């Protein structure tokens, strides 16, 4: 399970700015006006694409009139209760307030591990930063400027030190022989019906009412001598549509399931086509870098012309993930399930494939010779060498010079070239580009005395000519 870190504090102390800085997104609204964030929402803190922990942003707790019993405060209380670590965020420019004192007293009753994060330290003396909140008695205090990304490395390091010793890798290794599959999609597309069909029993509650599944449910399956771990998740909606507190927690559990799976099956309603909500779910899968299979459910109920329309809409809206296989099936009647498992296996094998340094360098050399990078403002990028940097998804680090001007079109060319050469199906491929990291830079072979004498003789010979 991904550990969870909650951001708690009064309004306008910079919680949403800190959330955006930790998750490298702009998901949280940021404004000088207090109270912009009312609900809680979730993101993931990653370094080089590897997830470290989930982050939940909460609304600011306001004065005693609404106080700790208000709706926004209830959201913050729920977030703090489910978190592994709480970050109590304060504003050094405004100093400690009575509301800060009230929130701290509530946090101490909660008995959750808590770090004091002093925000907006830019332009403030160190003496002021450390003295303003000294009376709170925190042993762990992290000064940051979320807006300028100052102190974030120290904050992440402190958070990791406080988190329980568990990770995605450990969760997956609980049964490394099983293929971990998450069935995800918007509400009421048939995820629970599909899992029940695969299991051959009514394990999940099935209803026409969207949102019947409120938690991620994990079950094991053995089929055709293969072992699987299936996760039926709650439907993901756009954030504006997520209202109930329980449903917000369900959305977080779904994001956790995506982070922990090896293959994500995105279930679509063939009759409704690809909707904006489907795009929201797909974005979560792509952000996590997971292998993907697209399943068009309720295919058997479509007429010929409806199927043609569905295919056309799919190619137009999901053309940017044309590397993912599409399976047409009926969860209700069981058609297409064998092809679904075949697609899952192909995606799983591709996502976890191991590469040697020699074979990826050979591929880079051929790609470079076939189509060199274009000249950008008189500069041409040089790709010197590449090495594999991980799997699920396959990741490669390319070293060279002037890589900052390498156009996105050429990066996509490399991705497609590697995908075709190594027959990678159903998995994203990531490239990281590094400049000036030549391992042999600054190193020289020390010449022996004999080599030095030989070089001198050669130089005398050259001079006589």
UniProtKB/Swiss-Prot annotation:
PROSITE patterns: G_ENGA
Binding site for GTP 2: 185-192, 232-236, 297-300
UniProt entry tagged with the keyword Repeat: yes
Origin: domain of life: Bacteria
Keyword Repeat (UniProt): yes
A GO BP entry: ribosome biogenesis
Stored SUPFAM superfamilies: P-loop containing nucleoside triphosphate hydrolases
Occurrences of domain EngA-type G (ranges): 3-167, 179-352
Domain KH-like: 353-437
Gene3D superfamilies referenced in this protein's UniProt entry, alphabetically: 3.30.300.20, P-loop containing nucleotide triphosphate hydrolases
Protein name: GTPase Der
Native source organism of the sequence: Xylella fastidiosa (strain M12)
Chain's gene name: der
């Amino acid at each position: 399970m991904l550990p969870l870190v909650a951001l708690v504090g009064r309004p306008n102390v910079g919680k949403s700015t800190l959330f955006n800085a930790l998750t490298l997104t702009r998901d949280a609204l940021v404004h000088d006006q207090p109270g912009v964030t009312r609900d809680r929402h979730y993101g993931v803190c990653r370094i080089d694409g590897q997830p470290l922990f989930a982050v939940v942003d909460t609304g600011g707790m306001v004065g005693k009139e609404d106080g700790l019993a208000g709706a926004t405060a209830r959201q913050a209380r729920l977030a703090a209760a489910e978190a592994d670590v709480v970050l109590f965020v304060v504003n050094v420019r405004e100093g400690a307030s009575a509301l800060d004192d009230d929130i701290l007293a509530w946090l101490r009753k909660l008995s959750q591990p808590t770090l004091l994060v002093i925000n907006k330290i830019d332009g403030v003396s160190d003496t002021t930063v450390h003295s303003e909140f000294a009376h709170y008695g925190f042993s762990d205090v992290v000064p940051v400027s979320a807006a300028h990304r100052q102190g974030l490395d120290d904050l992440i390091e402190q958070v990791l030190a406080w988190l329980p010793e568990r990770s995605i890798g450990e969760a997956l290794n609980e049964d490394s022989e099983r293929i971990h599959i998450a069935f995800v999609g918007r509400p009421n597309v048939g995820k629970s019906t599909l899992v029940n069909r695969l299991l051959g029993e009514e394990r999940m509650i099935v209803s026409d009412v969207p949102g019947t599944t409120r938690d991620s449910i994990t079950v094991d399956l053995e089929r055709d001598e293969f072992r699987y771990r299936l996760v039926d998740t709650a439907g993901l909606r756009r954030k504006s549509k997520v209202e109930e507190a329980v449903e917000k927690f369900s959305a977080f559990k779904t994001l956790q399931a995506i982070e922990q799976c090896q293959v994500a099956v995105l279930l679509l309603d063939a009759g409704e086509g690809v909707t904006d909500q489907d795009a929201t779910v797909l974005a979560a899968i792509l952000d996590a870098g997971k292998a993907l299979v697209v399943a068009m459910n309720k295919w058997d109920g479509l007429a010929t012309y409806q199927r043609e329309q569905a295919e056309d809409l799919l190619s137009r809206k999901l053309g940017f993930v044309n590397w993912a296989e599409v399976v047409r099936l009926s969860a209700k009647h069981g058609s297409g399930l064998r092809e679904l498992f075949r697609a899952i296996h192909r995606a799983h094998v591709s996502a976890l494939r191991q590469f040697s340094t020699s074979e990826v360098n050979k591929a880079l050399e051929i790609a470079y010779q076939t189509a060199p990078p274009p000249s950008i403002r008189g500069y041409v990028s040089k790709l010197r060498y590449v090495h594999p940097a991980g799997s699920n998804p396959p990741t490669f680090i390319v070293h060279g010079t002037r890589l900052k001007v390498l156009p996105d079109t050429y990066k996509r060319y490399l991705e497609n070239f590697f995908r075709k050469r190594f027959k990678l199906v159903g998995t994203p491929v990531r490239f990281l580009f590094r400049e000036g990291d030549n391992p042999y830079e600054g190193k020289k072979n020390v010449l022996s005395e004999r080599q030095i004498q030989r070089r001198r003789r050669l130089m005398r010979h050259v001079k006589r000519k």
